[in-house]
């Protein structure tokens, strides 16, 4: 999804309660990872919740999937998938996720721990993209 489209979608939602509900709904639509994929190697460090991210073996575009034990975090994973999955590794590396995060208004609306976890997920996704690009 184009970042501007996602920002527009968020702006259509009036209150933060509606935006949180939207994130939760996005998370509910996220396909779960298998038990085998929810392992230490795929775990994202720096998140208060349990978070796992995996990527398909495709050097030309990053297709990643993720899961968490927290509803809002699952929504944030879904949001990152919408923005970053399906792009080339170089596009993933170049995306200014911090700017998008701020423009979505999330910077001031989620806890510092959750924000740190969000950026830990972004770094893990970028690492997965770099691994795919390196072959």
Predicted regions and their residues:
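Active-site- and interface-proximal helix/loop "cap" or "latch" segments in soluble metabolic
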Residues: 73-108, 115
